[in-house]
UniProtKB/Swiss-Prot annotation:
Protein name: Nucleotide-binding protein PBPRA2024
Keyword Nucleotide-binding belongs to the record: yes
Entry function: Nucleotide-binding protein.
Pfam families named in the record: DUF520 (PF04461)
Family, similarity comment: Belongs to the YajQ family.
Superkingdom, taxonomy of origin: Bacteria
Species this protein is from: Photobacterium profundum (strain SS9)
Any GO molecular function: nucleotide binding
Entries under InterPro entries matching the protein: DUF520, UPF0234-like_C, UPF0234_N, YajQ-like_sf
This protein's UniProt keywords: Nucleotide-binding
Length: 161
């Protein structure tokens, strides 16, 4: 029986490249001239520090743009609380890796509510979808890909015929 897995993974090599491009852009931007600002990547977390809240927002926007250029979905990015220490503002940006159980249940429920002739089952941090026909699997892929309510980007992996 044909099957595929629904996963949610972020390519951290591309994230590192986007952070490096953002740091390069930070050095050339006029509005960041003579300003203590930095953007670093360390163990799946991007740390952003600046002198003001507005500049922090600008740096996050630069990062989002560079992530989009590197084809990393911005929905996988979650910005943590902004912290002010002395005259510096800082925030951490984390990336969703894997499908949480609540989201996996929503995916399975969405597929079952569509009344497609497929079976969806949760297997750890991925959802396996099986069917008798390849066309049914492709319909399930389109359904999950176009569903905005799930709030997380998905990739389709391990397609077997």
């Amino acid at each position: 029986m044909p099957s595929f897995d629904i996963v949610s993974e972020v390519d951290f090599v591309e994230v590192r490249n986007a952070v490096d491009n953002s740091a390069r852009e930070l050095k050339t931007r006029f509005d960041f001239k003579n300003v203590e600002a930095s953007i670093t990547f360390d163990k799946e977390i991007v740390k952003i520090t600046t002198e003001s809240d507005f500049q922090l927002t600008q740096l996050v926007s630069i990062l989002r743009g560079n992530l989009a250029k590197r084809e990393v979905d911005a929905q996988s990015m979650t910005q943590k609380d902004t912290v002010r220490t002395g005259k510096a503002w800082a925030c951490n940006v984390e990336f969703k890796q894997g499908i949480e159980s609540d989201t996996a249940k929503k995916v399975v429920k969405t597929i079952k509510d569509a009344k497609l002739k497929v079976q969806a089952s949760i297997q750890g941090e991925k959802v396996r979808v099986t069917a008798k026909k390849r066309d049914d699997l492709q319909a399930a892929m389109a359904l999950v890909r176009n569903n905005e309510e799930l709030g997380q980007p998905f990739q389709f992996d391990n397609f077997r015929d």
